Regions:
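A short, conserved alpha-helix within the catalytic core of class I
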Residues: 145, 155-156, 177-194
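Rossmann-like AdoMet
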Residues: 1-95, 99-146, 154, 163
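Conserved beta-strand signature within the Rossmann-like core of class I S-adenosyl-L-methionine
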Residues: 168, 187, 192-210
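Short, well-ordered secondary-structure micro-motifs
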Residues: 156-158, 213-215
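Hydrophobic anchor residue in the Rossmann-like NAD(P) cofactor-binding loop of oxidoreductases
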Residues: 150
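Short, surface-exposed basic-aromatic patches at helix termini and helix-loop junctions that form
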Residues: 108-110, 160-162, 188-195
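Short alpha-helix
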Residues: 226-234
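Short SAM/SAH-binding signature in class I
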Residues: 160-176
């Protein structure tokens, strides 16, 4: 399969994109880890997108050890489930920022809950094509994907202009890629969105390093499922 995708007269070189923006490859790594943990919707997306362990857990410059993959996978599942539970219990429209390729849109749609996935244009191009295909036809209208610049308030405001009522914004795996100035701008933008629409913001990133250390110190405990069970030969 070509490493270049043409979409609406735009050409995206995904190999180059990983070099200049590591967030892109991290999104696919997250999806693969969720699939390895036994998430069937994530596994379906992984197969549809043709992702592999080697391609998603490593890059041209780094290679993760089995222990690092295991620790990251455990931490990811804890965070993913916690954020989903908080968002669902809020009763507000979920705004996943960044949404990546996770199957949360599928899970919320199946429950009849509205979902807005916001991310970089290149991620949205793929997510908006692959994810709705796994959502029952009568529930597709609950899911919307929007390309945004999280450091630009106008971009966020426009992406959410058709949301009626309060929002629950969830953020996982984003701030570590921002400078202090960019992180401050994001916080200001989220504050303005919440002042306008009401709701809440759940941010997992501030405890990410501590969670990883705790998981790695626990060491050697099995996760739910494994790569062979999720992706049998053939």
């Amino acid at each position: 399969m070509s490493n270049t995708l043409k979409w609406n007269d735009a050409t995206v070189d995904y190999g180059l994109l990983e070099k200049v923006n590591p967030v892109f490859n991290t999104a696919k790594m997250t999806l693969f880890q969720l699939a390895a943990n036994g998430n069937t919707d994530a596994a379906a997306l992984v197969r549809d997108m043709g992702l592999t362990l080697e391609a998603t857990q490593n890059s041209a410059t780094t290679k993760a050890s089995p222990e690092q993959v295991l620790g990251g996978t455990i931490m990811l599942e804890i965070r993913y489930r916690t954020m989903a539970r908080l968002a669902e219990e809020s009763g507000d429209t979920l705004v996943d920022l960044p949404c990546g390729y996770t199957p949360r849109a599928i899970e919320f749609a199946k429950k009849g809950l509205a979902y807005y996935g916001l991310d970089l244009p290149a991620v949205i191009q793929e997510a908006a094509e692959k994810i709705p295909a796994l959502i029952p036809p009568e529930q597709k209208k609950l899911v919307r994907f929007r390309a945004v610049d999280a450091t630009n308030y106008t971009s966020l405001e426009k992406a959410l202009e058709d949301v009626d009522g309060p929002v629950c914004i969830t953020t996982e795996g984003l701030l570590m890629y921002f400078t202090d100035s960019e992180a401050g701008t994001l916080c200001d933008n989220i504050r303005r969105i919440l002042e306008k629409k009401g709701g809440c913001w759940y941010l997992a990133d501030v405890e990410c390093s501590l969670q990883y250390v705790i998981v790695m110190r626990a060491g050697g405990r099995p996760v739910h499922g494994n790569h062979e069970e999720c992706f049998p030969a053939g």
